[in-house]
Amino acid sequence: MKNKLPPFIEIYRALIATPSISATEEALDQSNADLITLLADWFKDLGFNVEVQPVPGTRNKFNMLASCGQGAGGLLLAGHTDTVPFDDGRWTRDPFTLTEHDGKLYGLGTADMKGFFAFILDALRDVDVTKLKKPLYILATADEETSMAGARYFAETTALRPDCAIIGEPTSLQPVRAHKGHISNAIRIQGQSGHSSDPARGVNAIELMHDAIGHILQLRDNLKERYHYDAFTVPYPTLNLGHIHGGDASNRICACCELHMDIRPLPGMTLNELNGLLNDALAPVSERWPGRLTVDELHPPIPGYECPPNHQLVEVVEKLLGAKTEVVNYCTEAPFIQTLCPTLVLGPGSINQAHQPDEYLETRFIKPTRELITQVIHHFCWH
């Protein structure tokens, strides 16, 4: 029953008080089971059917899908339940206690992005879900901050095909219809160690990596020349050399060298295409030194994403907000949800607060976010 639903600020407080950190380090990683249970109970109270989905390959993580209404199409509102870890020494407040001060709500996940679920639940108080003409779906995912395993698995396994979706990441209520992807690789070269007094008796992995880097930088230049998307502030795919390590002593021939790099592809560039370009760039080194060079993923790749600019979802949201859609350089779960239906990224709070000490959401977002959620539900589920 709706009268069982706590007040908005108490929903928010309970979400922030329930830790759900995702991290690659097992010691920091936490299950989101308790948070999923909270959300599931609240949506059941509102009359939704709720399905909780274990996410394979994770440390006890779950997705939740709440659904109401019959038929095809409808609207999907989506967000992730996890947060990044926090640096205790840099926070001046308890990250798990919602604190309101000077027009701001402080806490880990206030902006990115547990708060979005509080806004959805609050908006649904005034919606008679029994009268929906099209279905409404609420998706809460796991592990967005690390592998995006929750969104990947949901997109791979669901039969749902809504008319459209909105992911409530913090965009300051500015609608986002496209972003770049992210590919992160480790280039590893295995040499042959030996005493530095006789270089010919070994294979110096640093020297081979020097050769490989030259080819990678040529790929970077080629990407910049061949691919363009003028709407982005950086209108071409970027390639960054982020970390390198090799050798262990000045008097030893380096036996191993490893380089970590990333590429941020434009929408429309496929992951297979990029892998092919990287392999082609490194082919001269591999051919000269067979079996010594390998390329491995550091993280599961994320493709670029774009919602068609003339789609009804874009037109409706631009009209409701009086603002044009934008493109951004950071990544979200949108590429995976977009495989199901046209998708926008749109939510309260600023991306500048994401992953920051003393994360906060400004209270000025409360009223317009509630109104926006109500309006899009009315438009896509009642018309």
From Swiss-Prot:
One of its GO terms (molecular function) is zinc ion binding. Its cofactor is Zn(2+); Co(2+); glutathione. Binds 2 Zn(2+) or Co(2+) ions per subunit. Its EC number is 3.5.1.16. Its main location: cytoplasm. It catalyses: N(2)-acetyl-L-ornithine + H2O = L-ornithine + acetate. It is an enzyme of class 3 (hydrolase). Zn(2+) 1 binds at H80, D112, E169. Zn(2+) 2 binds at D112, E145, H355. Homodimer. This is Acetylornithine deacetylase. The lineage of its organism: Bacteria, Pseudomonadati, Pseudomonadota, Gammaproteobacteria, Enterobacterales.
